[in-house]
Amino acid sequence: HNANIKFQIKICEIDQIKDNIDIAIIATNSLNRAILTEKLLSNVTVKNIIFEKFLFQNRFEYTNIKNLLKEQKVKAWVNQWMSSSIAFVEMAKWFGNDLQEIKVEGKNWGLACNSVHFLDYLDAITGRGKLTVKENNLDSEILESKRLGYFELTGSFTISSESGVLLHLACVDEKDLDNNKITIKMKGKRRYLEASLSLGTLKCNYYDDDTESSFKEYAILLQSQMTGGIIETLYDTNSCILPTYEQSMKQHLVLFDCFEGIFNKQLKLDGCCPVT
């Protein structure tokens, strides 16, 4: 904790903000986030922004905000925690260069809104090259989200990193079942692990050449529990462990490639993903 950082809580409209801002966290829903960002940056100078995911609903907004951030020299990151999680970093390091495939499966875990965390993980551990949709087997039916006006998807799709590591994401909908446990399987030529992620705990079995070698349990902090440390580090060092805006933009637009055809067909929306 840095005792030199002083906090002040004030609730006001954007056009009432008069002081320049060191760090802004833009945590609206995806429909309003781009509009709010434009309004904020037209009113005051902002040094750093942390966006929440899912970033924006409309494809064109990604480039517009990218250009605006560049024009105003704003540093920006997106709150995707997985690639900097101690547990997930350790899992990737255990494989070294041996990793070939990651499979993520579960029930009602929010495929549309949460896949971007796993995309950033794949992106980070494979050198942040090009990401490509290899398979798209999403169900044609869309589901209403818990938030009015937003939707979820089920089915599966596969993304490939530039180095050839595959990420397979799958989700099924089971009515009246509020079980968002996720199973994660990572496979290499010699090594394999299977992990279960649920309620802030990751339980992981590591196997080497088909022989169980170890078991480890990790505590996974909620994003809200990590925010304070992220802000303090950014304030002290002018650096951030989260993916940059442009890295996250690339990942989101890959998801647009997967999702927007279904939303266009079902909701008659062009270039739009109503996910938050």
Language-model features: where?
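NAD(P)-binding Rossmann-fold cofactor-contacting core
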Residues: H1-N4
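Short acidic low-complexity segments
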Residues: F7-N20
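Rossmann-like dinucleotide-binding domain that binds NAD(P)(H)
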Residues: I102-K181, E246-K250
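C-terminal helix-rich "cap/oligomerization" subdomain common to oxidoreductases
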Residues: I23-T28, E232-T276
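Amphipathic, non-transmembrane alpha-helical secondary structure
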Residues: D15-K18, A34-S42, V89-A92
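NAD(P)-dinucleotide binding in Rossmann-like oxidoreductases
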Residues: Y150, S160-E232, S239-E246
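Rossmann-like NAD(P)H-binding beta-loop-alpha module
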Residues: M82-I102
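Beta-strand-loop-alpha-helix segment that lines the small-molecule cofactor/substrate pocket
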Residues: I23-I26, S30, A34-W81
